[in-house]
């Protein structure tokens, strides 16, 4: 049996980051989307990342960002993995020359297969519930029966 990959997102302070890493999570996520209630400025992320254990992967979550904004955020550390939650193309996501996670909003069964096909070079796919005008961490569960009969050849969250 494979060990699950555990990522806690929405970290906004060093205390929460320390708690998450004490629980041996694989990754912690920082929301770089200014419209999010869990938005954190990149300067604060830089402070938190300095304190992370070597084996904890920092992930930065973006929604339809500019190339320059992503680049400036990723320049903080070569360990950072970007996670894209908007309408970014595979070409855009892969233009940063590092692994990335692509969130795919799911409202119907076909979204699962299309998401993994359209982002074939993603490190992982994050399947997220489709909620109109709400991106990432919706707190809503989509119909997991959609996975029945699917052959997804990509790691996913």
Label each region the model flagged.
Residues 1-157:
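Conserved N-terminal beta1-alpha1 strand-loop-helix module at the mouth
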